[in-house]
Amino acid sequence: NQFAESGIKSVRFVGGEPFLLLSDLAVWTKRIKELGMDSTIVTNASWGRTKESARKALEMLPDLDNLVISSDKFHLEFIEPNTVKNAIEVALQYGKNVIMNITYIEKEDIQYMMQLFGSYRDRIIIQMVKTMPFDGSEAEQIVKHCYFQKPHRTPKFCWIGNYFISASGDVYACCQSSIGTETNYLTLGNLKEERLPDLISKAHKREVYRYIRKNGPRGIVKAFLESPYKDELMELEFASGCEICQKLLNDPDKYEYFLKYIQEE
């Protein structure tokens, strides 16, 4: 109810794996539809081991609008391609809009995944999503850029305003800021303490929120090019604009500088 009151048009369930809470999803997607909003579930498609199991799952979700299937070479080590294909085919039979997010590190990953799922391109949307930074043996393969050396190449687009709500009720201005726990630079509050419309209204008045929404990651790079941290940042590599924001603004000292910068601008 608070989502609709806040003017939110679409609600997306992510995990973990949301289909583990299938009965709850049935209730939530029904209410979302009643309130005139759009619903999406992001899933690994593990419930599609057979077409029958896929049908049983989707029969419980008649009000679901969109299904985002997230897959990559890593997922396929645990979830067979046929399981993913079953989920796609049954979802199409039930009239769902199907989007497949293929996460990749190298271009070869895209080629491999398209060999498996490319035949669906005329029936679903297939999106290539660059892997976000992570810790692990393959982390060094992620392509990164020295954005401070070429600030004009820094992305200006930002996902701020696509609010992320955790299972505990914490509200963040975007997904990436949910790991910004050192400074809570875009933590908006908690639904158990305040209503969502009030949290969003307060967020729109915060200088940090307004600056990032207007200028995006490119504006953050611009701000720090005039800082005492300029030299150390010149050699740093970032995989995305989101990582720029999270790495710099979740550092207490750099965040303090940033606050002073935007107040003086």
What does each model-found stretch correspond to?
Residues N1, R55, P81-A87, E108-M114:
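Well-ordered, non-membrane alpha-helical segments in soluble/globular domains
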Residues Q2-E5, T29-E34, K56-L64, N86-Q93:
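Acidic (Asp/Glu)-rich catalytic clusters
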Residues I8-L21, L35-E52, L61-T83, N97-I105:
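Core AdoMet radical
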Residues L25-A26:
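Short alpha-helix within the catalytic core of nucleotide-sugar-dependent glycosyltransferases
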Residues A54-L76, M113-P133:
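Structural recognition of alpha->loop->beta junctions
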Residues I69, G169, L196:
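Conserved, mostly hydrophobic/aromatic
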Residues I99, I105-G180, N215-K230, A239:
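A C-terminal junction/extension of Radical SAM enzymes
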Residues T181-E265:
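Flexible mid-to-C-terminal extensions adjoining Fe-S/redox cofactors in radical SAM and related proteins
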